[in-house]
């Protein structure tokens, strides 16, 4: 991995949301004007109002962001500037002498949190009864404009984003060959990775494939 504190374009990253930001979110949710919302008692015209009130109360009174923040920060994270955009990504180096690089891309609306339960088994299969030779080095990026990645200067389509992710894998991280996996928009992006960057992408795995490119 070629990212460290001495490099301006790629540095270690940890999530640390200020208390003031968290409090602001809680205050806004708590103060939401529910009386202004139409209520037909069902789901025909959107989310059920009673359900949304219950969800908001859970968010205000029970949800513990710090717990989830700590769970994400267990993994090594970085931010790298690619094509002028700061790309946030998890980089979990796999076990053994030669783990296969694997980039996994989320969809919309989604984040890298989708992958929290699979990163460790993929990177360290021996901890779960598997074989160390089946390990992957897992790279889970936040797509541009999502999570802790910066927003692009204009709308970017999946093909453009695929080029950014390939640059992350080959130019920033230095991998000659890797596997691409994705679902939803991540599946479309992964398909473009395989189509446009076949010299680097050895395989693609799509959990929600597109019918045509």
Predicted regions: what is each one?
Residues 99-107:
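Short beta-strand element of the alpha/beta-hydrolase
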Residues 182, 186:
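Gly/Ala-rich beta-loop-alpha elbow adjacent to hydrolase catalytic centers
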Residues 162-178:
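Conserved acidic catalytic loop of the alpha/beta-hydrolase fold
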Residues 204-210:
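Conserved small/polar residues in nucleotide/adenosyl-binding loops
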Residues 130, 143-156, 191:
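Glycine-rich "HGGG/HGxG" loop immediately N-terminal to the catalytic nucleophile
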Residues 21-94, 98:
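Non-catalytic accessory segments flanking enzyme active sites
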Residues 109-115:
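Short substrate-entry loop that stabilizes the transition state in hydrolases
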Residues 187-196:
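Short glycine-enriched nucleophile-adjacent loop
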């Amino acid at each position: 991995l070629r990212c460290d504190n001495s490099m301006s374009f790629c540095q270690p990253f940890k999530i640390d949301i200020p208390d003031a930001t968290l409090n602001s979110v809680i205050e806004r949710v708590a103060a939401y004007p529910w009386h202004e919302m139409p209520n037909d008692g069902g789901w025909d015209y959107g989310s059920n109002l009673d359900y949304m009130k219950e969800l908001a109360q859970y968010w205000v009174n029970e949800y513990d962001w710090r717990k989830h923040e700590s769970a994400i920060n267990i993994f090594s994270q970085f931010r790298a500037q690619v094509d002028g955009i700061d790309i946030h990504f998890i980089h979990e180096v796999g076990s053994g002498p030669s783990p296969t690089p694997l980039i996994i891309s989320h969809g919309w609306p989604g984040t890298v949190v989708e992958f929290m339960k699979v990163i460790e088994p993929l990177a360290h299969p021996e901890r779960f009864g598997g074989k160390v030779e089946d390990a992957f080095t897992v790279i889970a990026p936040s797509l541009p404009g999502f999570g802790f990645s910066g927003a692009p200067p204009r709308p970017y389509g999946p093909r453009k984003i695929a080029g950014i992710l390939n640059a992350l894998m080959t130019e920033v991280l230095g991998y000659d060959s890797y596997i691409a996996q994705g679902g939803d928009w991540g599946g479309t992006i992964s398909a473009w990775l395989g189509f446009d960057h076949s010299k680097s992408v050895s395989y693609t795995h799509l959990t929600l494939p597109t019918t045509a490119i």
